[in-house]
């Protein structure tokens, strides 16, 4: 049975598809230029909107480069940030901007990778030029472009695309009818494809068969829980967090795939007695968090959220103070690559050696 709204949005989706394909054709035929960066570029992005596990993969790649002695920089758009233009989030020694100024995901990457330079800019080319100008004395070995599969104005040494296997990817429709930014055939631009959020390997089989026809290297990964971090009171500590199975909680989040958050908690034995969800990147207000706190207090529940939501609130410390009178935790996740890790590592090393 067809969704009436979907049918109404279909003409707009067809129009969007035509525009996307025209733009890509112009880049493919070099009628629109792609700038060559003086620093090697690794792009990590996806074909769909949100929920692919991109940020944990960016974090994994940054940590891998650091582990082999490379100095990575991260350039992100900083979605829903309050600042404008090119902004230095971290100079690789100190985080300089709040999450409200840099965007929640970018702040999370900066705090979790203190040795990496992090910049936000809508125009990534301007961010690269800023980096080259201001960090000539300690130039990064590689620049990681976050969420840049569609950002074709910059050439890249390695183009990584992520697919969320838990969603009906092969039948997904284009924006605004569906969640796709580009049609599936545009995966041909990818040098490497990461099949992510694989909980059931059989679910990935149809996508694997479709993609293998292209001959693009495939990596298989899942999102795993790294730790539960307590941020009640004045401290932040994973050591203070109790076993997950002992927690009865109100879960709240403003992410694109809230059900995956609940599923992760459920698999670890957390009892979710209530939940409150908001749209992705939605700013928290004192009113919303007061309502959440009062519900948790009346039911005797702990509060648990995502790491991204924690960093979004961190930009406004007065908001965190509203809820931390109760036990509060955030769930830290990571990318677990269970097939093809050596291929990914080899291609990451090769990208740096290209210049």
UniProtKB/Swiss-Prot annotation:
Give the EC number(s) under which this enzyme is classified.
2.7.1.130
Q: Which GO terms describe its molecular function?
A: ATP binding; tetraacyldisaccharide 4'-kinase activity
Pathway terms, separated by semicolons: Glycolipid biosynthesis; lipid IV(A) biosynthesis; lipid IV(A) from (3R)-3-hydroxytetradecanoyl-[acyl-carrier-protein] and UDP-N-acetyl-alpha-D-glucosamine: step 6/6
> What keywords does the record list, in alphabetical order?
ATP-binding, Kinase, Lipid A biosynthesis, Lipid biosynthesis, Lipid metabolism, Nucleotide-binding, Transferase
InterPro entries recorded for this chain? LpxK, P-loop_NTPase
Cellular component (GO) terms are: plasma membrane
GO terms for biological process, alphabetical: lipid A biosynthetic process; lipopolysaccharide core region biosynthetic process
What is the reaction catalyzed? Answer: a lipid A disaccharide + ATP = a lipid IVA + ADP + H(+)
Residues holding ATP: 48-55
* Recorded family membership: Belongs to the LpxK family.
Q: What exactly does this protein do?
A: Transfers the gamma-phosphate of ATP to the 4'-position of a tetraacyldisaccharide 1-phosphate intermediate (termed DS-1-P) to form tetraacyldisaccharide 1,4'-bis-phosphate (lipid IVA).
Full protein name: Tetraacyldisaccharide 4'-kinase
